[in-house]
Every structure is written in structure tokens, then in C-alpha cells.
A protein has these predicted regions:
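Short glycine/serine/threonine-rich phosphate/pyrophosphate-binding segments
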Residues: 53-57, 114-121
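Generic N-terminal amphipathic, Lys/Arg-enriched alpha-helix
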Residues: 1-21
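A short, small-residue-rich loop immediately preceding and capping a beta-strand
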Residues: 43-47, 102-113
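Short alpha-helices
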Residues: 136-188
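Cofactor-binding loop segments of dinucleotide-utilizing enzymes, especially the Rossmann-like FAD-
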Residues: 49, 81, 111, 137-138
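Hydrophobic beta-strand scaffold residues
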Residues: 44-45, 129-132
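Glycine-rich, small/polar surface segments that engage phosphate groups of diverse ligands
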Residues: 33-100
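Surface-exposed amphipathic alpha-helices with a cationic face
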Residues: 122-129
Length: 190
């Protein structure tokens, strides 16, 4: 069992090193979109399929309450997975359609091969003129295909659902931290 534990830690570290090498530009571009949306008075919506839903909710929470220091809340809403849509696949989309608009941003998280609710949310966001940041994995077969030229994909270099979930959490923390640092640079000096 000791070797198994060491093997899991090694795999975690290797995945993080690969992500650090591959994802820097995409993360910076996503953070810029997020900051620009917030500074221009836009709203940010986020959602995730299955295990990624918890990371989406966490992202909304830290964007509202602050991660690295106390600050005013950012306009971020986690879309509810249990919202009573007539068709389960449209749960997230039905929450975007009434209030999403040009200048808003949708952040989607997906750790699996398919993501019907996330895909319908993306279609709704695109129909409303919104931009999209997608945090995906190598297993993704749907989400990346819906992205436009101005959207951003952060594709985690793994198919292992545990490693992907770990990096999703790390990435949403990073996006929040980068946003805080850009919007409130004076807090870094204190």
C-alpha cells in the first residue's frame, strides 16, 4: 500500500508539472477575460458537470467572499444543478437565458467525456453573446467543439478523473487569486 500512496502522489505532481508547462497562456487569457468582465460591469456565471459542479460552486463562493484578502464581492453566480428545468439537460441553460447578455462570461468546468448540461449552457451563452472559459480534460469530447475564437479553453493534461478534479480546484483558486491581484493591486503591498 505504501507504494500505491507514493504512486498517487507522484502522478499528482507529474500532472501539475505538465499543467504548469502547458496551461500558463490559457490561464492568463482566462484571467484577463474574467477581470475585463468584472471591471466592465459584466456578470460571471459558472457551472460544472458531475464532480466538477463542486469546483464551480467553490469558485462562485471564493469570488463572492474573497480568497487572498478581504474585498468587495465580485458578481459571480453558480448555476444550480438541481434547478427544476423541464428537461434535465437544460438545467443550466434555463438559468442563463433570462439574464445573460453580451459582456457577461460563462465559466464551465467538465471532468468527463460528455457534458450535456454544460453544452446546453454554452449554447445559451453563445446565443446571448457571452464569452466562455472552459476548464476541460483530455477526456472531453463535446465542450471544446462549442468554443468560439474569442473563448478560452484550459485543457487539463489528464484523463484521470481524480487528477482532473484536483486541478480544477487549483485552477479556480488561481483564477480568483489572479483576478483579485489585478483588480486590487494595492492589497498586495500591505
Amino acid at each position: 500500500m505504501q507504494q500505491q500512496v507514493k504512486s498517487i502522489f507522484t502522478e499528482c505532481i507529474q500532472t501539475q508539472i505538465a499543467a504548469a508547462d502547458l496551461l500558463q497562456d490559457a490561464v492568463m487569457h482566462a484571467a484577463e477575460l474574467l477581470v475585463n468582465t468584472l471591471l466592465n460591469g459584466g456578470k460571471v456565471f459558472c457551472c460544472g458537470e458531475r464532480m466538477a459542479h463542486a469546483s464551480a460552486r467553490h469558485f462562485a463562493h471564493i469570488m463572492l467572499t474573497g480568497l487572498d484578502f478581504e474585498r468587495p464581492p465580485f458578481a459571480v453566480t453558480a448555476l444550480h444543478a438541481d434547478f427544476g428545468a423541464r428537461e434535465h439537460e437544460y438545467t443550466f441553460a434555463q438559468q442563463i437565458l433570462p439574464s445573460g447578455q453580451t459582456g457577461d462570461l460563462l465559466i464551465v468546468l467538465n471532468a468527463s467525456a460528455t457534458a450535456p448540461r454544460v453544452c446546453r449552457a454554452m449554447e445559451a451563452a453563445l446565443s446571448r453573446g457571452m464569452l466562455i472559459v472552459a476548464l476541460t480534460s483530455e477526456a472531453d469530447q463535446q465542450v471544446a467543439g462549442l468554443l468560439g475564437p474569442e473563448d478560452v479553453e484550459i485543457r487539463i493534461p489528464s484523463r484521470n478523473s481524480a487528477r482532473v478534479s484536483e486541478l480544477l480546484l487549483q485552477l479556480v483558486n488561481m483564477l480568483c487569486s489572479l483576478s483579485e491581484q489585478q483588480i486590487f493591486p494595492q492589497e498586495l503591498d500591505e
